[in-house]
Structure formats: structure tokens, C-alpha cells
Amino acid sequence: VALLKTRARLLRDIRDFFHQRGVMEIETPLLSMAGNTDPEIQSTRTRDGRYLRTSPEFALKRLLATGSGDVYELGRVFRESEAGRSHNPEFTMLEWYRTGYSYYQLMDEVAALVRHIGRDKFSAWQVEKLTYRELFERYLGLDPCTADRAALASAAKRHDVGDIALSRRQWLDLLMSLVIQPALPGQQLTFVYDYPAEQAALARVRPDTPPVAERFELYLGRTELANGYQELTDATEQRQRFDAENELRSQRGLDVYRIEEHLVDTLEHGLPECAGVALGVDRLLMALSGAEDINEVIAFPASRA
């Protein structure tokens, strides 16, 4: 019962935060005709060929293009094959979009939300922002934007975290999750931004040397909590990314998903400049309550659903 009350208070605080800032709550469909083409995410498909959403992102962007203004959604999402201490195949996600915002401004709002919700716990925690490149240079002594697969594999070997054949992106993800993340400060909000271009997902790529994705992640202590973008607004580039992800899925022997044509059409007609972010509500509740396992903060986890 205490857990149910804590969760209810958390959801109320989230809604109060956005009400005070004039951001409108939206409900979008749980089922879609398109899947998530990201090869690191597996969508659940129904017998009639629809997919349970892995995020409300596509639908929220379609509303933004109609002139909805700033919006958020607080609801359930689904990702197959996700299980573990901080994963459940069905979980609660908070996602919101701010028109006219930069991703730097959105980082500040994410920090404000976390401190608002965890005012008794996180208000004294410092906030640090550093680029993905600065992070890797600090903890591994290498430049992730220029290091090749051999250099990344060598760094992994030095830390005893892998002796397998991986792509450059997979090596970066492995080093991030198994070497850097466990070494982050335990009581700090750490924002990591400007990712390598190959990790852009749906973020805009800035033509630096080398190019970087205008993307950020928030680590609450050592827990990955949120993932945000300066949103891509180019329809042609978005279609190319969907196609490239499906090609990679095919190469890995994964299901190839129907792409989100509605989103491509939306971008062709014009998506306003905006920044958006998704935040794991169950993980935030874990941090607030001191829980060590996501099963402790979900009334009906997969094992008991």
C-alpha cells in the first residue's frame, strides 16, 4: 500500500509540474501500424499485424505538427525481451515536447522536474553537463568520435568487459554501460550530450568535425533515467534512417518492421522546431524509494502479471 501511495504522489507531482508550466497532457494510441525500427529495441506485434508502442513519440510529433503546442504523455509502453534489475517489458514512460526549445533548455527543465519530484532527496545534488566526448576522455582516456573498433575493443579488454566481435556503436554502448556508468558519481545529476552521429536515432545531427547528434541522456546517480533530442525535422533524412535501421535489423536476423509513414508525412508537411525527452518513471520511483529492483516499484511486474 505504501508503494501505491508513493507512485500516486509521484504521478500527481508530475502532472502538477506540467500544469504549472502550461504543457498539455495528451493520450495517444497504444497500438500502431508501425514498429520501432531501432535494432536495439524489439516491438511486440499483435495477431492482426499491429504493434504495441515502445514510446508515444511518433503520435505526439504528429500532434505537434497540427499546432497542439507543448505536450506531454504519461503512460504505459512495451518493449519485448527487456527484463532485469532495471527493466520490465511493460513500464511507465513520461515523454514531453517543447516547441522553440533547444536541447540545452530541455536539459534544464528535466533537472527542474527531477528536483521538483524529489525535493526531499535530490535538491542538494549537483548537476553536471558534459559532452559524450568529454565523458569518454575522462573515464577511458580516448576520443569516442574518432576511435576505431580496435581502439574501443582494446579499452574494453583493459577493463575486462568483452572479448567479442562488435560494431563501433556496440563497443561504445558496452563501454558506456559496463565501464563508465558504474563509475559515475552516486549523488549527482549527470547530463551527457552531443553523441556520435551514428547514435543519433531521431535527433538532429550537427555538421561539426566530426558530426555530432544533438542528443542528451540524464544519469540520476548511476541510473540512466532520460533520453532527449533536438528533434529531426527533415523527412528525407528520417526515411533514410528508418531504412538503414531496418537494413541493420535484417543483417542481425531480427524482424524488419513497417516504418512510420505517418511521421514521414508529418515531417514533409512541417514539424515545428522542438526538443523532446522520454523519462523512465519506474526508475525515478526506484531512486526515490531506494529500491534495488524495478519489481519492487511495480505492483504487477512481468513475473506476476
Functional labels for PLM-detected ranges:
Residues V23, L140-L142, V161:
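Short aromatic/hydrophobic-glycine micro-motifs
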Residues V1-Q42, L279:
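TRNA-binding/sensing appendages of the translation machinery
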Residues S102-E128, Y132:
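Acidic, low-complexity central loop/insert segments
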Residues P29-G35, P39-L63, Y72-T99, P144-A305:
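A translation/RNA-centric and nucleic-acid-associated enzymatic feature enriched
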Residues F17-R21, I117, P182:
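Short alpha-helical functional segments enriched in proximate histidine and acidic residues
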Residues R7, L11, R15, H19, ...:
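Hydrophobic face of alpha-helices
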